[in-house]
């Protein structure tokens, strides 16, 4: 009986260690640099509205109306997602951690561009080479929330 308990405790400890290892270390260079977000690395596990190449490029979250209201709405939308935790917030910048079903952590960043009528985005996996399109799909899911879909439709 005691051996069984020890095995279960060890198994739970190993599982917890594996899940923690999946989180990876937060990159120290995230944030706003010279008024913009970092470019994506060459690996395909990142998307950015500031990227020039098609592989990494994703459209920003566009809106019509008050920029502060749009950014506030984003701040309210993100925590509704069970995989999302806001970890840094200023009046124009948000950094979030997205947790995948397998326990991996991806970093998301949102930068308000009030003059451009959009919120620039960057989403990147901490570990691995490919994300199988997860970062792109996640940003597109967020885009479908108000007020972004209305602005998308009006801009077309």
Regions found by a protein language model. Give the residues of each.
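Sec-dependent bacterial lipoprotein signal peptides
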Residues: 1-20
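Ser/Thr-rich, low-complexity intrinsically disordered terminal regions
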Residues: 22-156
């Amino acid at each position: 009986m005691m051996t069984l308990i020890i095995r279960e405790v060890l198994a739970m400890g190993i599982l917890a260690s594996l899940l923690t290892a999946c989180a990876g270390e937060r990159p120290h260079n995230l944030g706003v640099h010279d008024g913009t977000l970092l470019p994506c690395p060459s690996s395909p596990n990142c998307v950015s509205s500031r990227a020039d190449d098609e592989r990494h490029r994703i459209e920003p979250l566009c809106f019509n109306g008050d920029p502060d209201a749009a950014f506030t709405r984003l701040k309210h939308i993100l925590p509704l997602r069970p995989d999302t935790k806001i970890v840094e917030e200023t009046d124009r910048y948000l950094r979030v951690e997205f947790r995948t079903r397998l326990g991996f952590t991806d970093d998301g960043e949102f930068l308000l561009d009030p003059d451009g009528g959009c919120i620039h985005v960057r989403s990147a996996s901490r570990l691995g080479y490919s994300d199988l399109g997860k970062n792109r799909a996640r940003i597109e899911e967020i885009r479908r929330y108000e007020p972004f879909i209305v602005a998308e439709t009006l801009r077309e």
